[in-house]
């Protein structure tokens, strides 16, 4: 009887040759090969050996222990994994209802141990199957076959099936849901082209080629809900596939989750995960100093997304672990192009010209980052095309305002959340430097929670945007419209450019990294010269926690992938 051979995408050997020639890096090879369905172990082998790739299994989830993408400390290094304990997290707790409408990463983190994803992009920016066992894609990247792991049980005892996956795609792709996920699929997929092949297999028939489908499935609002989902994940009644169950949700106060029985993955000790008894997410308000004090006092064990002030306060604390994370996280100063005077590109570009980027980075973020170029593609993105950093040019700004017929100084109020102290310092610096460029800038300050409520509505504001592993993931979220010309839900500036949208769709279906980078060069130039955003710098970020908790590993998007976190009693205090 012949051994079954699974199909390998024909671009994989071509890219392997590019790797051999030094045209792509090993990391770039691994990221693309795994997106095309090659399992990570096989992709590593191909990267190392340099021979023509053999027939290999498609991307497949590892055995139940350890979990996919886990970053567990080997038992030999830590003595032995122990069970028990409660992890306490300092994090704000806003109102939420439907996961597809999550606007912020911390929304998803507070439910991430209860509801899971079809795929998982690890701290290495490589995407692996999760609730999926594998995926396969055809030569032209427009037919994706998703195969679920069999035997995964919801907390109510039901089995995870294609019916659940179809339910979620319908939720995501229905405009009435108002999900940012819709922007990632716009022009590629409609709900009619999502079909169940059998109980465990779903096919996506796309209208155009798309490379980043597996990463799109890990967009943080894409938590998989049971087919009976009641529309409000805070009601404590919705089944989950995760290792914990939701016990309490109180806006502005806390979220508590606890270990459940029967989780589908085992730990290194052979028993079902998780190791912890539970996690408490505690809202300590808008002031980061409260979180610093609580961490130092042992009242919490880690802080979600610590600010640069928090980093500076804690970086030399010997009782804590401080880990830097390479990321594309950024503060985006955006102008609504559907409101005057921002309908005029000259006025938008004038605002960009009053950014003294070196001064902003030093004053707002104490030099902990790299300078930006007024476009939303980061140097950490593999398709980034290097650009010259724009200079501070107040005279050029005044000239543009004069050309636009704008009376000077131009009064501008910029909305900022005061809990983001670096954003406040950014706009304070901009206000001072902008005087010479014909601007009178004031800060419209509010608590972060208030900014979250109006972040897509305020005329001018600074919005924190989190890390995405590819630029072709973030750009369609914020800078395109639907087929009727209506800006997508997260297009907070309402900027839509036909040439930009056409090139972006081309980039999303381009396999060759060099070719994609060439397209990205044009996209970056378009956004820099006629776009709606200013990007002064890209942030360094940190993971800060008490080392008594093991496997509390850093993730560039601050995702809490914590199913294997455990409390080391030898380090407990």
Whereabouts are the PLM-identified features?
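Structural transition elements
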Residues: 244, 370-403, 418-425
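A structural "hinge/loop" feature
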Residues: 91-109, 131, 158, 212-222, ...
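N-terminal lobe/hinge region of extracytoplasmic solute-binding protein
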Residues: 90-139, 170, 239
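Ligand-site clamp/hinge motif
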Residues: 263-313, 440-442
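Gly/Pro-rich hinge or "lid" segments in bacterial periplasmic/extracellular proteins
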Residues: 122-126, 217-280, 289, 395, ...
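Ligand/substrate-recognition segments at binding pockets and active sites
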Residues: 53, 89, 251, 294-300, ...
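Detector for C-terminal structural segments
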Residues: 14, 20, 31-46, 250-254, ...
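Surface-exposed binding/hinge segments that line
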Residues: 182-227, 248-250
